[in-house]
């Protein structure tokens, strides 16, 4: 047999690709594994032992940071998206059932006729000056504010089902006969015009509507020669029956609080710093029109 007819090993003449014995052989056959990072539980070929992969750690840290940034973005963008959704709902109302008066995009106009009762009966701002000019404060300092008529007009728009935002304005006119020696029979009056922004939620079932509302706003007050502009806090509840698709009738009750209602009043070119929290309860009949 001639020499050139002898079959040669595929490794002969290709020493660069030849695989030596031992661990190096596996590296020569699979050169990509030489630079492959060691995973948890793998053995280092150079000395053995279990190692954490640095690249895996970097990936874990990077993914945690990305999740944190996404959560932060949602916390920042969420309220803005909610406001935009409310504005969009107001501009593009959903065509719902005509009897569904609490659906998003619906609006309500309310007219109320109520009786208002003050929850105080003593020394309203010292307007009669009985405490200042007469030693008998028990006789001359008391101002009696009597129950009176109140009227209110309100508007609310439902930004989503049951949840509404609106505005409420009312007028209260109370008569008073202060017991003082200067004008014992002259009637005084107390006038209040509160205007408040409101937020409410309405529970609806069948034809019954049960709204709960809270609000805060501006209040104008005038009593005798005293005038005050200040804060008013309101809370209201009602019960209405849906008569038709657009009209409902019911009753409501309202609590109004005027904190520090007599601070820094101006009375006959004289400033006083008497303070009092005025509180009123009003209840009456309401008529509502649903848009």
Swiss-Prot record:
Keyword set includes Nucleus: no
Organism superkingdom: Bacteria
Predominant subcellular localization, coarse grouping: membrane
SUPFAM superfamilies: OMPA-like
UniProt keywords, alphabetically: Cell membrane, Membrane, Transmembrane, Transmembrane helix
Keyword hit for Nucleotide-binding: no
GO CC terms in record: plasma membrane
Family in the record: To T.pallidum TP_0733.
Protein name (record): Uncharacterized protein TP_0126
The species this protein was found in: Treponema pallidum (strain Nichols)
């Amino acid at each position: 047999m001639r020499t050139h007819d002898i079959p040669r090993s595929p490794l002969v003449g290709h020493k660069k690709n030849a695989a030596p014995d031992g661990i190096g052989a596996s590296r020569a056959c699979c050169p990509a594994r030489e630079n492959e990072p060691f995973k948890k539980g793998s053995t280092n070929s150079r000395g053995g032992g279990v190692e954490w992969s640095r690249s895996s750690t970097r990936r874990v840290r990077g993914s945690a940071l990305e999740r944190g940034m996404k959560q932060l973005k949602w916390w920042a963008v969420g309220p803005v998206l909610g406001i935009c959704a409310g504005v969009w709902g107001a501009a593009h109302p959903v065509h719902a059932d005509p009897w569904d008066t609490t659906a998003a995009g619906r609006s309500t106009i309310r007219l109320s006729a109520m009786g208002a009762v003050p929850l105080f009966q003593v020394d309203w701002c010292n307007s009669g000056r009985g405490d200042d000019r007469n030693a008998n404060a028990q006789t001359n300092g008391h101002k009696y504010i009597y129950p009176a008529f109140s009227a209110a007009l309100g508007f609310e728009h439902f930004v989503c089902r049951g949840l509404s935002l609106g505005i409420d304005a009312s007028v209260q006119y109370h008569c008073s006969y202060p017991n003082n020696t200067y004008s014992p029979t002259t009637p005084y009056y107390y006038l209040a015009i509160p205007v408040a922004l409101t937020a409410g939620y309405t529970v609806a079932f069948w034809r019954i509507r049960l709204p709960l509302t809270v609000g805060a706003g501006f209040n104008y007050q005038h009593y005798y020669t005293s005038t005050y502009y200040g804060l008013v806090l309101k809370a209201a509840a009602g019960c209405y029956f849906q008569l038709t698709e657009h009209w409902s009738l019911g009753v409501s009750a309202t609590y109004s609080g005027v904190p520090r209602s007599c601070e820094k009043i101006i009375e006959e070119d004289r400033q006083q710093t008497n303070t009092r929290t005025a509180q009123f309860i009003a209840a009456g009949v309401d008529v509502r029109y649903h848009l």
